[in-house]
């Protein structure tokens, strides 16, 4: 069932929360780097009033639990509860048994590690249907109803919190490196969310479509879809070819097209995740190793 609560998902949400918490304690807090979203607010409260993030994280997220229940349903509520409680638990553990690794002399490295750990942790949590509460839920709702990647929504919200942190306890240098960490995290979240199997999509318009598609099929063993179109100026019906290939085959695809029709119109676009035969399945419909 789509809405079934799975132990596998809960397990990976716990793993993601542990990775996130480790990065936050050992790279953000130790090097006075802020963070965005509700996590950034917990760090702000810690810097100004010495309130433990493990406690303020739970307190701030109580209202969000009700939003999660009403708008995201029972399964999302459970995963959000697990993610939020696990985050606070791991924050408490890592603060209690902290490994001292200060990198104030190299904030660029600290920001990179902070972004990687937080991005990887949140990416895993999101991929398995969970959130850590707060802006994570807002980002998931925006992604669900408007199709905007979660990383972008979070980056915008994060910027607002970081500006507030700059006005209260961050230096300009720390604020700039915090933005670097947030950017790295946002990119990594999108990468993990989209599956990591990126490809290129080519839209081809040519008077020699038959020869082009035949050569693609024979030499590259890639499928080609024929779309129906109409020229804006001539009003003539035309066939438009669409082909998706791995990034490392794009040069070969261009070479095939150019060898038949150097004047062909070719538009190449990014394809963030590809499923199906030739990419995630072999010719016998068995999963390919990724």
From Swiss-Prot:
GO terms for cellular component: plasma membrane. Its main location: membrane. Pfam families: DUF2179, YitT_membrane. It comes from the Bacteria. Keywords: Cell membrane, Membrane, Transmembrane, Transmembrane helix. It is found in: Cell membrane. The keyword Mitochondrion does not apply. It is a multi-pass membrane protein. InterPro entries: DUF2179, N-reg_PII/ATP_PRibTrfase_C, UPF0750_membrane, YitT. The chain crosses the membrane at residues 9-29, 47-67, 75-95, 106-126, 146-166, 179-199. The keyword Transmembrane applies. Belongs to the UPF0750 family. This is UPF0750 membrane protein YpjC.
């Amino acid at each position: 069932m789509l809405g079934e609560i799975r132990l596998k998902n809960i397990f990976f949400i716990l793993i993601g929360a542990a990775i996130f918490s480790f990065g936050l304690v050992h790279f953000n807090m130790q090097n006075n780097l802020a963070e965005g979203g509700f996590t950034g607010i917990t760090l702000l409260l810690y810097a100004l009033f010495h309130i433990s993030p493990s406690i303020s994280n739970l307190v701030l997220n109580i209202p969000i639990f009700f939003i999660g229940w009403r708008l995201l349903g029972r399964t999302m509520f459970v995963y959000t509860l697990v993610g939020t409680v696990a985050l606070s638990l791991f924050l408490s553990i890592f603060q209690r048994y902290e490994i001292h690794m200060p990198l104030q002399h190299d904030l660029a490295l600290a920001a990179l590690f902070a972004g990687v750990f937080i991005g990887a942790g949140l990416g895993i949590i999101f991929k398995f249907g969970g959130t850590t509460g707060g802006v994570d839920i807002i980002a998931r709702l925006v992604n669900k109803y408007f199709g905007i990647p979660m990383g972008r929504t979070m980056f915008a919200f994060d910027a607002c919190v970081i500006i507030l942190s700059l006005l209260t306890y961050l230096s300009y240098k720390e604020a700039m490196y915090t933005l670097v960490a947030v950017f790295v995290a946002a990119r990594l979240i999108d990468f993990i969310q989209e599956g990591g199997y990126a490809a290129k999509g080519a839209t081809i318009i040519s008077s020699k479509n038959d020869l082009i598609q035949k050569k693609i099929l024979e030499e590259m063993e890639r499928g080609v879809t024929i779309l129906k179109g109409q020229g804006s100026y001539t009003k003539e019906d035309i066939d438009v070819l669409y082909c998706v290939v791995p990034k490392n085959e794009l040069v070969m695809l261009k070479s095939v097209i150019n060898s038949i029709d150097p004047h062909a119109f070719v538009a190449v676009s990014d394809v963030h995740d590809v499923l199906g035969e030739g990419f995630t399945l072999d010719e016998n419909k068995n999963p390919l190793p990724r």
